[in-house]
């Protein structure tokens, strides 16, 4: 008799070895139809796996978070089969699940969007056939024989230590895979190819160039339709298009992956940094600055040279090898060591807006979201073990204040100790409990990612949610047990002995360039008044009023309002329309009447028009709105 314990503590008993699907059917046929896989002892398995011992089983249904990833993994196999059916000489490499979908790298002749309908039609046939996904385990030698005509699979197999290799079959199609998979192809209701791009085998430019084919999949066609609508909305908000139209930033081949910020973009940039500095000063941080380029010896000491060398830019100065910093942390360690510290000095909170460079393959670059040079708002907090909880709580409260200023919600994830880590069990327990207790006190729900922490300490990842409901991982709070050890950081305790400080490494904006791009898309270019690159524009109705318009502009600027004047010979209607398209919050029209009375006619983006406003009526509420960094459009 095999006894299966379900999550509600109920027990299902079977005379013979049951499969996962048998357990599901034991609940109900309707429930079984929605089951995708099962979890036993933390491992996800196919539903046709036999259960040979008493155990606890969690059945994964289409409603569970893991289900979509399993579905998309299976969809990648469907896409691969379709491509092979149409292109017999295509050689498959790898096909992982990625955010919002999946891709498969394939050695084949170049394809384009024009080929998608044919491939999608073939995929639809495979889905309609409801082909079961069948797992088999074969020897390494058998696997090499099976895939002997595919050098990429042979290389993958030779790189495996396992002597038993798992493969999956749907009909006549066979692929190398660990699984698990959905029961059959018919469970894929919404399936769509998204785009194609080039890629290199093993991400090595010296190796074969492949075709990377992206797709997405859902359990429901309505979900696919909603997702495609979201994609279209995102295209309208593309920060690259809006940034170009509004004159915020640009990219040039002479510095690939390194953005150029224009005057209007710098107005926004400076506002972001001014706000960051105001909040950090109020929270007890000091601001520091470390060099952009430092000696190889420093990077060897920090561990970056060993683990991150291929992403670093280097140079030789006076016969010594230097590296442009990919991260700010090691410089922060040197700053801490320049002075002796007592427990009375702690916590010490030091922030830096540091310019870092990381080499990215040209194919991976994507606007402001993926660049080679960017600024990171790092801060390092040095503390005693007793201060962990209160400092983490302080960081979370600071995160909430900053993100809320932009109308960004967020959720939290706690990542715990991975298999490979440094530090003792006691250190990890103390660090993890400190994070957990702070999260519990903070009171917002959080997920736990077991084993997903950094090797040097547990962390909290902060995922913001934008206006389209998309999530972005920007902020992170990490407890670092490696760098204080590597740099021999100490403080004198109450016992007059030397102790190792606990260090938090945290970012809130993350890459400021990336955060800038997120804000462009979040607001779709319609920024709140305090952040808008141009806060007001003066439009004279004819050329005779140009001098007066300039006088108005200068007075507004002298009061701290960012203002332009449009002196073109276009119609007033066209100039108003262009100002609205560029989301200028305050559109001021000047006619003879306004000149004579010394007043303004002001139009706001919510469609309201205020006539006959004196400077005394206009400037104070505008400045109050700016200084309060308000989000709403109710300015006057």
From Swiss-Prot:
Its cofactor is Zn(2+). Binds 1 zinc ion per subunit. Residues 1-61 form the TGS domain. Keywords: Aminoacyl-tRNA synthetase, ATP-binding, Cytoplasm, Ligase, Metal-binding, Nucleotide-binding, Protein biosynthesis, RNA-binding, tRNA-binding, Zinc. GO terms for cellular component: cytoplasm. It catalyses: tRNA(Thr) + L-threonine + ATP = L-threonyl-tRNA(Thr) + AMP + diphosphate + H(+). InterPro entries: aa-tRNA-synt_IIb, aa-tRNA-synth_II, aa-tRNA-synth_II/BPL/LPL, Anticodon-bd, Anticodon-bd_dom_sf, Beta-grasp_dom_sf, TGS, TGS-like. Belongs to the class-II aminoacyl-tRNA synthetase family. Catalyzes the attachment of threonine to tRNA(Thr) in a two-step reaction: L-threonine is first activated by ATP to form Thr-AMP and then transferred to the acceptor end of tRNA(Thr). Also edits incorrectly charged L-seryl-tRNA(Thr). Homodimer. This is Threonine--tRNA ligase. It comes from Desulforapulum autotrophicum (strain ATCC 43914 / DSM 3382 / VKM B-1955 / HRM2). The gene is thrS.
